A protein has these predicted regions:
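ATP/NTP phosphate-donor binding region
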Residues: 1-60, 67, 71-78, 99, ...
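Short active-site-adjacent helix-start/loop capping segments
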Residues: 66-69, 91-93
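Catalytic core of DAGKc-family lipid kinases
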Residues: 5-8, 34-36, 75-185
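Short, contiguous clusters of charged residues that form electrostatic/catalytic patches at enzyme active sites
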Residues: 64-67, 113
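Structural motif
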Residues: 60-61, 85
């Protein structure tokens, strides 16, 4: 029997993340599962040092959870087998892999190494499928604000439409890729 650490985001899928992560018990019937609420992990270095190198890690959440994990665990070599179980509301990364929510966890070690880095106002972040700036970042920020005020599900389509019509203002960007600079206004 192997040990699998299930890192889950309880806020994913409009607050259904815990419930969806618990479905892994049906997939991993013969394994010992240790559930860890990602929002309560204060440092991934300590977490990774505390687990066996043979233990699997299963990351449960959506695209935001995946990007947050990648940045919060920056510097970790991802030597443990690392899997992704999409429990978000969008799951674009999962769809990029040709999968859908509810499929068995997919190994992602190869996808989380050597990721692109974006630096904005002196803060650098890695990203796997989205940067979190522009209209995407605006929608996530507004969604977080609404989540703090209410338990109702977040409608990101409505946020995007209202943002594009009334509130969101695009910013200029200078991007360096492989030593070449590109400007966007």
């Amino acid at each position: 029997m192997s040990v699998k650490y299930i890192l889950y985001n309880p806020l994913s899928c409009n607050g259904k993340g815990t419930e969806l992560a618990k479905k892994l018990a049906e997939i991993y019937k013969d394994d010992e599962l240790k559930y860890c609420n990602m929002t309560q992990i204060s440092g991934y270095g300590t977490f990774f040092d505390s687990i066996s190198p043979e233990s699997d890690i299963v990351l449960c959440g959506g695209d935001g959870t995946l990007n947050r994990f990648i940045n919060d665990s920056d510097g970790y070599p991802y030597e443990n087998p690392l899997y992704y179980y999409g429990t978000g509301s969008g799951n674009d990364f999962l769809r990029d892999l040709g999968m859908e929510q509810g499929c068995e966890p997919v190994r992602i070690n190869e996808y989380v190494r050597n990721l692109p880095i974006v630096t904005v106002n002196g803060k650098s972040s890695r990203f796997i499928n989205a940067i979190g700036y522009g209209i995407d970042g605006y929608c996530c920020e507004k969604g977080d604000e609404l989540r703090e005020k209410s338990d109702k599900p977040i409608n990101y389509t409505s946020i995007a439409v209202k943002g594009l019509l009334f509130h969101f203002r695009p910013a200029n960007a200078v991007i360096n890729v492989d030593g070449r600079e590109y400007s966007y206004k």
